[in-house]
Each structure stands twice: as structure tokens, then as C-alpha cells.
Amino acid sequence: ERERNRTSNRIELSNQQTQTERKMERYFKLTEETIVNEAGRKLRQIECIRDFKFAHAGELGGFIEKEENLGGEAWVDEEAQVWGEAKVINGSVLRGNARVYGHATVKNGSVIYDEARVYDYALVDGCFVGGQAKVYGKSWLALGVTMADQAEVFGLASIESSSCLLHNASVSGRACLNYATVLSTDAYVTRNFDCCQFHNLCPEAGITSVYRTKAGDLRVYHADEVYTLEAFTELIERADSESIFKQVYPAVLAVIKARFEL
């Protein structure tokens, strides 16, 4: 009988602890303020109920469809929205007019901002997506990727390791990019063979990226500028003969031509 009482007390104490933990974990509530969004979904505004990293108690946030859309001290600012089976979790935040929906997951301190969209089954893990960028399909971003402007990632593509997509860069298919890849204007990458890069070859540029466009020709991203291959060749030819750029980049040009079978 004593053992039964001890067991009962332990269970009761465990239940009380679980309820307390849940109460401590809860940091927002759904308000009665509702909207019907552009997708025809009825969403409810959230309100912060205790101070944490992104909001203070009583502060209103954005709109979500259900409590399961948000967790782990993640937050949605006033104009941002989450719906469907999508989840924004683990200290991530939506700002501006960002939208996350479908079965997408945004986690581990990611920031989705401006007019950015993450949807379908996409995963954004510890990354920054802004501008009018889109991440969709079954694609995923991880480990500090930055997307901006009108960049898109979709299909089964994966990008990681502080890579950066700018302007109208597009990555799709089964492309798998890492090692701080930088893609910019007119990039159209559907497989790994569509791009390559060179690191720390001269003081002017930490990264020189070469990639295909949708038309099939090449662009070179170097020192924050984008060149056609012809223009980049001229840049090398005009360089000071004493510069590291002049000494190193003719060899880089030869590698580019061999790599892309020119």
C-alpha cells in the first residue's frame, strides 16, 4: 500500500511538473482578431504573453492559422503570416510581409523577411531569406545561406555553408551547392556542373564564381561585379602586369574553359 502511494505521488508530481513546464514554455496566444488572407485561409493574430527575445508581453504579432504553426520561441511580426501545416520554430522570426505555408519548415534562428516566400515542403534551417526570394518544392537551405532580391530555390536543390544567392539567381533540379557559393545575376543552376568557384586568389575578391545562365552562356561574379566571360577575359588582359590578379587569373581562365568545355 505504501509503495502504491509513493508511485501515485510520483505520478502526480510528474504531472504537476509537466503542466508547469508547459505553462513556462507557452509564450503566445491566439487572439480573436481574424483575417482571410490571399489564399482564402482564415488566420488569427497572435499576442505575446511573456517577454522573450522577439517580443514583450502584450505585444501583438502577425497571423497564423493554428498554434501548431509556431513554437520554440519563434515569432511572426504583424504583417507576416503562416498557415497550412507549415512550422516556424526554434527561435526563427518572420518580418515584413513574409509568408510561410504548405508543409514548409523554418527553424534554428532563420529570418524570413520583406516579401519572401517559403512553401511546399521546403526547409530553411538557420538561414536568411529576404527581398522577393522564394524557396519551394522539396528544396532546403542550411548553415547560414543568404537569399535576396528575386532569387529562387526549388525542386530538390540543396544549398548550405554560407552560400549567397542574389538578384534573379535560380537553383533547382538536384543541384547541391556548398562552400560559400555565390550566385548572382542570371544564374541558372540545375546541377552541380553548372557552376564552380575559386577562393582567395587575389586581394580584390575572396570568391570568384562562374555559372551558367538560362541561355547556356557563362557569367563571372568577381569583386561584387558580374561579367560575361568575354568581359572578364578583357579585364584580365588589361590588368597591371605586376598585380596578383594578372599573374593568377590567366590560369583561372584556363580552368574555366576546361571545366565548361569551351
Range-by-range predicted roles:
Residues N9-E12, R26, S161-S162, G173, ...:
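Terminal low-complexity, poorly structured segments
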